[in-house]
Amino acid sequence: MATTMNAAVSLTSSNSSSFPATSCAIAPERIRFTKGAFYYKSNNVVTGKRVFSIKAQITTETDTPTPAKKVEKVSKKNEEGVIVNRYRPKEPYTGKCLLNTKITADDAPGETWHMVFSHQGEIPYREGQSVGVIADGIDKNGKPHKVRLYSIASSALGDLGNSETVSLCVKRLVYTNDQGETVKGVCSNFLCDLAPGSDVKLTGPVGKEMLMPKDPNATVIMLATGTGIAPFRSFLWKMFFEKHDDYKFNGLAWLFLGVPTTSSLLYQEEFDKMKAKAPENFRVDYAISREQANDKGEKMYIQTRMAQYAAELWELLKKDNTFVYMCGLKGMEKGIDDIMVSLAANDGIDWFDYKKQLKKAEQWNVEVY
């Protein structure tokens, strides 16, 4: 027996633009989108902010699920069907922007945008891969701009559920240099300013380091700062917003997300829906550094939040079906190591030696910048 629940996907936004498109309804056992163009919905009574919505219907099983069989580990490097570098910088694929919407509040320290590009099935990526973007124009030497890689923020089915779109989560880079001049990142500003209907040159897909585990019983610990949330949104959509014949997540997905302010939180409404749908399978903890502190008065960075669950995390790391993924600012890596050093030492284990073993077993996966 199956029932259908409404799972509207809402992206908090004060600025949004969209390109009329016909969304699709694929097989009834998977995610099903209503027909129509993208649109605004202004019903967030708490903040009064405008909300961009993609309405979806998620089919879920109400019967007791059949226990999943233990999945034999296969190296991601040898995983079948994973495509890399179908499109390269010299011959990129030209996609089209369907949607570009700002998903941080106006008072957030910096802008982050969610964008959806069509690829007509020509860039068949997996959750955890990246795509390259080549900004329009030329550099100061008169040459085309170099490729900039971005982690994919959508599942392999894409936000429209038809395997023909790819989504990115991009922060607009603007800073002041030593001479007091305002500098804008070429590719991030190109993307954040991209109008729906515009062409965009894409390369890839690339990468196998961050591919999500195939084991539906796995414990997946995700550590993200800012736009490092992108690959984990792709994981979580597959786990909780889609139904697949060959995959039903029965494990534990635990997300730690670090941001500076509440107004910088990304995809919070989606994560709230996931928690409501699968409270036993999904946990999320936020670390809001400019607004929260621990008992010692220290700012709440991602490693500070993790320290509150240190013993529990260490016990999970002892299991052979626990996988850790880290994506975002490189600075968080040392803080996380500092926590683990003392925990491992309590068991007479050298953390850095143990981490090497985890990496070799593909249970410790890092993509930082």
Curated annotation (Swiss-Prot):
Induction: By nitrate. Gene3D superfamilies: Nucleotide-binding domain of ferredoxin-NADP reductase (FNR) module, Translation factors. Pathway: Energy metabolism; photosynthesis. GO terms for biological process: defense response to fungus; photosynthesis. It is found in: Plastid, Chloroplast stroma; Plastid, Chloroplast thylakoid membrane. It comes from the Eukaryota. Plays a key role in regulating the relative amounts of cyclic and non-cyclic electron flow to meet the demands of the plant for ATP and reducing power. This is Ferredoxin--NADP reductase, leaf isozyme 2, chloroplastic.
